Amino acid sequence: SWTSDRRTEILERAKHFSKKFEPLSAAGWSLRGCGAYFAFVDHPFKEGSETLAPLILRDQGILLMPGTMFYPKYDPHGPRTFRIAFANIDKNKITTLLERLKNLSYQRFDRKEYNEVK
């Protein structure tokens, strides 16, 4: 049925996102969670997600939602996190998206320092 096929497609897309995200770990990214339509990821940069989101849109044409839109103000994860929507792109575009994120070259922060603040 259409519903069953659509469900399978959605689940496969989420699985593909998680699998293709793995190489980003070496570049300092981490996958906080991945659902059927969105993923929450920690980025490796010194600047917060609110500052970086418009820069990434300008430089790479990638629209990311800053984590500060989804976390309480006092939560330190908000500035370190992006929400990525992948519901309307196919597996090839997911792969391209993640390769482009991996190659971003903004100033990176020291993850050890961040882990101590948590």
Say what each PLM segment does:
Residues 41-45, 86-88:
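Short beta-strand-to-loop capping motifs
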